[in-house]
């Protein structure tokens, strides 16, 4: 049967996120890599889209489904103004959402519940239902049965909404049996796109509700005898030579949800020596519901298996090593440490991989940090998003209007953070959120700021009150009642040990290709410098300028130019000082119009259909020279203090004249390019790559590839467009040919080459760039060490290949001489 709405795992790759979401794409990737993944298929995002756009309902249908609820609140308003003829479900959904104040939790709960009820109550179109039934039948027949147990999981597809950000927001259904039950669970997955939490998150992050879709993964259920999670790099010590395995009895939900304390095993890569075992008391386990034959229940291990199983080692030593080796295989495939869910099936005794995602929380921490604190009371558990210990007075806030309540050293507690809360986050001793995952805003910013954070606690804003005192363990994801002195003392010792000059770190790898770091905020300069990076390949201006809280041009027009200059100079100096004498490349302002428009005073910003192709970068800088002039004045102030390690980097350059005019503005404030500062450009526009020789002749010292934009512009692909995002590929031959051409020409003229796009943090891309002869690679702070290792390995390979080639040539010459 030719399917329109179904994709089998075998048909999918990791690039298919827009089609089947992160979970689905990853399962397809692993299946095709030969990893033992239970087979299955995905009901594509197109099916959800077809459902909401083609199922039409009338006023009477809505009233029949909702009953008394139809006469209350927002839905009553929608019904009163709706036309009499039936219309697509999507229009009903958007009418309800557009009338919803997401900050009114009661209204948000009520309105999203109405949407979910409508989705669950309506019949699935026959064209979709028939395909699901047929695919389920085919899957069952693979195992010689009419029906098999499956898991049905939600998989969000909007590429710019990280999968982890949806943790606990969309649904997962286990031990589903029968085609009709599968169809029901797929609809329930669709409905879970409209939970209050997921809706609030999208609204606060500025995502368009109408463009977020959901895929449903239908996968053969592993009848787990034992299961768990493994990290292919020790997330506590950041040791990439160790694998950490957590294991418990039954289905893996107990481990993932934190309902059980699992066994923990530490395995050394390569030698496969089991370095450590911690056998836990496993009080509960999740199993298939024995009464209904469907779904799951949580039972006590002592009652279900027997008292002796509570403290029994879950995995045999042979199984520990088997799991660890499988983890290493998956890590090698992806080129990055992985967080993997695994299970042993009691029916065939085999190991299966259920899910894998990149580890995002690796940090340098001390082993002391995770010692048990027996006397302390744990009052909340969540995801350890940013390691370390923080303690202080709790301040609960619900939106950015309350950030002034958070004082220096407070513990910030909120539903979820957003960019407007960054000023408060900087002041906080620790951060706790109800929602979010390891790639949520709270997690990313906390890691960059070096502030301990626990996210996804679900109930922090309910359990904690302003004025409470807590201690936050951002490594283990725990929140303790009160100030735990032993943990706070350990933190002080750690800070003392980490202070500049307090200890001599292990000698870093020395590489011919420099490894630099990207810095978004001056506040993280010291931490970024501590990575051992060879300089800053990208210091972003956006955060410093946007943090003034007002449109910068309006700020200048109000006579506050000096204030802006001081603010910028302060930030630039902080980074230049932390890295001196290592180079710091400052990129001039590159914020698109939509970011400016959201600021106070930004009402006159133009409405652009695609701001990334619009008025930004050097284009805007030359049109509004007062802003560029303020940036150059700030740099001059820092240079006059003796910091001669600064470079100016112009974004979105496409013509030599832009370089010439920018230099004129710099000279007008007394800043001399090439003498006071190094002068460079971003290579983001294909035009810049093609005419690189002309740009060099205008006078530049360095170039840096902005691969995010370069890839989009070269391939004519909008990464935010789910229909074409799967075609986005930074390693596309056309992109690599442009990069290779620029590097070749720059070497001829002695111009330094670098990269500061997201690709700089990708091990695969780093290997390619080393072979192309790039001079430096700038990575995100948490990727610097990994990229340095990758660079060192690739350079050694190149030297070995060259030596072997020379040896073979000498042997051939010797043979010719002898014979």
Swiss-Prot record:
Q: Does the keyword Zinc apply?
A: no
Q: Which cofactor does it need?
A: Mg(2+)
Q: What class of enzyme is it?
A: transferase
- The active site is formed by 441 (tele-phosphohistidine intermediate), 756 (proton donor)
Task: List the EC numbers from the record.
Answer: 2.7.9.2
InterPro entries per the UniProt record, alphabetical:
ATP_grasp_subdomain_1, PEP-util_enz_mobile_dom, PEP_synth, PEP_util_AS, PEP_util_C, PEP_util_CS, Phosphohistidine_dom_sf, PPDK_AMP/ATP-bd
Binding residues annotated for Mg(2+), in chain numbering: 684, 709
Matching Gene3D superfamilies: ATP-grasp fold, A domain, ATP-grasp fold, B domain, Phosphoenolpyruvate-binding domains, Phosphohistidine domain
Q: What is known of its domains?
A: The N-terminal domain contains the ATP/Pi binding site, the central domain the pyrophosphate/phosphate carrier histidine, and the C-terminal domain the pyruvate binding site.
Q: What name is this protein filed under?
A: Probable phosphoenolpyruvate synthase
Native source organism of the sequence: Pyrococcus abyssi (strain GE5 / Orsay)
Q: What is the lineage of its organism?
A: Archaea, Methanobacteriati, Methanobacteriota, Thermococci, Thermococcales
């Amino acid at each position: 049967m030719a399917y329109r709405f179904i994709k089998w795992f075998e048909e999918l790759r990791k690039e298919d996120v827009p089609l089947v979401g992160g979970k689905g794409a990853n399962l397809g990737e692993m299946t095709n890599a030969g990893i033992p993944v239970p087979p299955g298929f995905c009901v594509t995002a197109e099916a959800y889209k077809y459902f909401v756009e083609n199922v039409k309902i009338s006023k009477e249908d809505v009233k029949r489904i909702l009953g008394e609820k139809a006469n209350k609140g927002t839905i009553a308003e929608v019904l009163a103004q709706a036309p009499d003829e039936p219309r697509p479900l999507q229009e009903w959904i958007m009418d309800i959402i557009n009338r919803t104040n997401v900050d009114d939790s009661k209204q948000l709960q009520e309105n999203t519940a109405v949407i979910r009820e409508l989705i669950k109550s309506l019949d699935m179109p026959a064209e979709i239902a028939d395909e699901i039934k047929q695919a389920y039948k085919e899957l069952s027949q693979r195992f010689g049965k009419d029906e098999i147990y499956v898991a049905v999981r939600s998989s969000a597809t909007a590429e710019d909404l990280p999968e982890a950000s949806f943790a606990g927001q969309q649904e997962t259904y286990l031990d589903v049996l029968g085609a009709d039950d599968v169809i029901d669970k797929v609809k329930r997955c669709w409905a879970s796109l409209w939970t209050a939490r997921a809706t609030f998150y999208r609204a606060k992050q500025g995502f368009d509700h109408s463009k977020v879709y959901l895929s449903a993964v239908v996968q053969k259920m592993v009848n787990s005898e034992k299961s768990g999670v493994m990290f292919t790099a020790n997330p506590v010590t950041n040791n990439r030579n160790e694998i950490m395995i957590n294991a418990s009895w039954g289905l893996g939900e107990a481990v993932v949800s934190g309902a059980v304390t699992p066994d923990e095993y530490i395995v050394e890569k390569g030698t496969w020596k089991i370095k450590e075992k911690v056998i836990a008391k496993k009080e509960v386990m999740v199993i298939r519901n024995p009464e209904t034959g469907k779904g799951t229940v949580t039972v006590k291990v002592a009652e279900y298996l027997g008292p002796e199983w509570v403290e029994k080692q879950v995995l045999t030593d042979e199984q520990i090593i088997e799991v660890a080796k499988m983890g290493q295989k998956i890590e090698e495939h992806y080129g990055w440490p992985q967080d993997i869910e695994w299970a042993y099936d009691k029916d065939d005794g085999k190991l299966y991989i259920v899910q894998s995602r990149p580890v995002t929380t690796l940090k340098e921490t001390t082993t002391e940090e995770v010692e048990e604190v027996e006397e302390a009371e744990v009052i909340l558990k969540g995801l350890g998003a940013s390691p370390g210990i923080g303690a202080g007075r709790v301040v609960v806030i619900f939106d950015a209007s309350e950030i002034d309540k958070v004082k220096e050293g407070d513990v910030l507690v909120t539903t979820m953070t957003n960019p407007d809360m960054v000023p408060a986050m900087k002041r906080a001793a620790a951060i706790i959120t109800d929602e979010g995952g390891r790639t949520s805003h709270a997690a990313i910013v906390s890691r960059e700021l070096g502030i301990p954070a626990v996210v996804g606690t679900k109930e922090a804003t309910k359990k904690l009150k302003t004025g409470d005192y807590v201690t936050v363990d951002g490594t283990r994801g725990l929140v303790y009642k009160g100030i735990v002195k032993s943990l706070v003392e350990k933190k002080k010792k750690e800070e003392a040990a980490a202070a500049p000059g307090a200890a001599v770190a292990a000698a870093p790898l020395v590489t011919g290709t420099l490894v630099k770091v990207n810095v978004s905020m001056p506040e993280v300069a010291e931490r970024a410098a501590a990575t051992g990076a060879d300089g800053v390949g990208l210091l972003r201006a956006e955060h410093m300028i946007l943090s003034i809280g007002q449109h910068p041009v309006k700020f200048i027009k109000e006579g506050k130019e000096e204030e802006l200059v001081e603010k910028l100079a302060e930030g630039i100096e902080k980074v230049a000082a932390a890295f001196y004498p290592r180079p710091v490349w400052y990129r001039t302002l590159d914020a698109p119009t939509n970011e400016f428009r959201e600021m106070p005073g930004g009402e006159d910003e133009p409405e652009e259909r695609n701001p990334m192709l619009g008025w930004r970068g050097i284009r805007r800088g030359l049109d509004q020279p007062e802003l560029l002039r303020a940036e150059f004045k700030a740099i001059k102030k820092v240079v006059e203090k003796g910091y001669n390690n600064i470079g100016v980097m112009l974004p979105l350059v496409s013509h030599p004249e832009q370089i010439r005019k920018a230099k004129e503005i710099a000279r007008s404030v007394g800043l001399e390019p090439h003498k006071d500062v190094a002068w460079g450009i971003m290579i983001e526009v294909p035009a810049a790559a093609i005419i690189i020789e002309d740009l060099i002749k205008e006078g530049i010292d360095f170039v840096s590839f902005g691969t995010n934009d370069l890839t989009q512009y070269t391939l004519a692909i909008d990464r935010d467009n789910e229909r074409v995002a799967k075609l986005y590929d930074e390693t596309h031959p056309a992109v690599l040919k442009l990069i290779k051409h620029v590097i070749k020409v720059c070497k001829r003229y002695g111009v330094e080459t670098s990269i500061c796009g997201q690709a700089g943090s990708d091990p695969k891309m780093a290997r390619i760039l080393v072979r192309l002869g790039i001079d430096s690679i700038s990575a995100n702070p948490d990727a610097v060490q990994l990229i340095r290792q990758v660079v060192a390995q690739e350079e050694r390979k190149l030297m070995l290949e060259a030596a072997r080639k020379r040896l073979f040539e000498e042997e051939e010459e010797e043979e010719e001489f002898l014979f």
